[in-house]
Design a protein with these regions (language model features):
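Charged, low-complexity helical/coil segments in non-catalytic cytosolic or luminal regions
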Residues: 2-171
Length: 174
């Protein structure tokens, strides 16, 4: 909005360590789909559209490493998903000194409770990647078979930043 200007955007910014479960494994999947190629052209005063339909089958096996699922019921799942991807290249073993000056959430959802969400994310990504191998103007997935195997789960505290702001006397955080 026009009245939401940069001079008063940030009320407070706070570093917060959020607990995550990191799932690694693989998903073997296959899709049956309908691929459609559409061609449109004009001849004289007429516009023509030609559609060609194709039966499509794809299968594949995708490996996943460290798919994050937040382990706190206090954090919004969609908000946590929106700050991905995380850079794991500089992850280190936990040291309490890292928490100095930061807030930290504790996990209250164990790895078994978070597993369905991890599997859903892995399976949706596998389906989407299989679909993306279909080179048609549009692709309608008709069936999707999958088998997911989680091979490893690790616990991690990942640093995030929360931004607090007020707009029209209503508090928001991002």
């Amino acid at each position: 909005p026009k009245d939401f200007n940069c001079d008063r955007v940030v009320d407070k910014m706070q570093g917060v360590y959020i607990p995550f479960w990191l799932y690694s494994g693989n998903c073997e999947g296959s899709i049956t789909a309908e691929g459609i190629n559409t061609r449109t052209w004009t001849s004289g005063n007429y516009r023509y559209t030609e559609k060609k339909y194709y039966s499509v089958y794809r299968n594949g096996n995708l490996n996943f490493k460290a798919v994050p699922v937040d382990a706190s019921s206090k954090t919004d799942d969609d908000a946590m998903d929106s700050i991905e991807p995380f850079d794991y290249s500089e992850m280190t073993a936990f040291n309490p000194g890292y928490l100095s000056g930061y807030l930290a959430e504790r996990y209250d959802e164990d790895k078994d409770k978070c597993l369905p969400r991890a599997k859903e994310r892995i399976e949706n990504t596998t389906r989407d990647e299989l679909r993306n191998t279909c080179n048609y103007n549009s692709v309608n997935v008709q069936s999707y078979e999958k088998h997911t195997e989680i091979k490893d789960v690790k616990y991690a505290m990942l640093p995030t930043w929360l931004l607090y702001t007020t707009y029209q006397d209503k508090p928001y955080f991002f």
